[in-house]
């Protein structure tokens, strides 16, 4: 049985949906896993807490599943040190995190909407996965930045990957991924519309004016976002049944190291009913 440590900031529906997607498959008997704890970097007792109601819904879900909830409030942890030396604070917070989860051994950590940067020692001690909204070797940054970079490059494909959490943000080895075309039916007319706009404006001007409302941007985001939940669950399934593992922070299977990340595109599309 795979012991899956769960780390989440619990700030909205996305955090709940990720946990529910994995637990639904566990409870149906489809995933041979245990989640020994859920760690959150908020206690929900903080005075300044704009996501209190959303986080309480997340906490209620965790408790409803009977999973131990472990919290270390980042806002209340050594606040003076955080103001004067953030790097030193991150090291100390990492020590507190590791101590807090030490009663709950786990095989693989899942950063599921976890919004703090993990310290170096925690990354070294545990194998942990993070979701990044791009293909292996693709753009870095937020999902917004990724999509606009793809548009600027006139890319043919987009996707999402699960990568190892390392000291360098978004630089760990890609472990699993799914991809999809951003050309063809449903896309070609949007690229053509962009080309017409580029006859009178630069891409930067279009980006500034439309940003999150650009039709091509929205289509790429829609098709990428709907793949994130099944990518997470299919990745967990691959680890649970032994098809995938991490050795020395690199992807491997039963026979040894893989040449690259494990391609879950077909399984993700099947889960979505995409032909």
PLM feature spans:
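One-carbon transfer enzymes
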Residues: 1-275
């Amino acid at each position: 049985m795979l012991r899956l440590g769960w780390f989440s900031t619990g700030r909205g529906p996305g955090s709940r949906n990720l946990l529910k997607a994995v637990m639904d498959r566990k409870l149906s008997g489809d995933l041979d896993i245990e989640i020994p704890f859920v760690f959150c970097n908020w206690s929900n007792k903080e005075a300044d807490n704009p996501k209190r109601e959303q986080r309480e819904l997340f906490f209620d879900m965790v408790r409803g599943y009977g999973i131990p909830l472990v919290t270390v409030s980042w806002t209340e942890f050594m606040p003076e040190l955080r103001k004067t030396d953030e790097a030193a604070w991150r090291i100390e917070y990492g020590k507190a995190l590791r101590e807090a989860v030490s009663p709950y051994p786990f095989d693989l950590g899942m950063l599921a909407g976890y919004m703090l940067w993990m310290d170096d020692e925690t990354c070294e001690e545990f194998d942990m996965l993070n979701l990044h909204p791009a293909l292996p070797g693709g753009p870095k940054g937020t999902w917004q930045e990724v999509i606009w970079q793809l548009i600027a490059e006139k890319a043919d494909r987009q996707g999402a990957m699960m990568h190892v959490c390392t000291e360098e943000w978004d630089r760990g080895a890609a472990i699993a991924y799914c991809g999809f075309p951003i050309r063809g039916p449903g896309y070609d007319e949007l690229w053509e519309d962009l080309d017409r706009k580029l006859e009178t404006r630069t891409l930067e001007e279009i980006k500034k004016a439309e940003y999150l409302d650009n039709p091509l941007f929205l289509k790429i985001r829609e098709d990428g976002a709907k793949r994130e939940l099944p990518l997470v669950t299919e990745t967990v399934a691959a680890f649970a049944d032994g098809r995938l593992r991490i050795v020395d922070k690199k992807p491997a299977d039963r026979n040894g190291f893989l040449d690259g990340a494990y391609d879950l595109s077909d399984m993700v599309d099947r889960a979505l009913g995409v032909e």
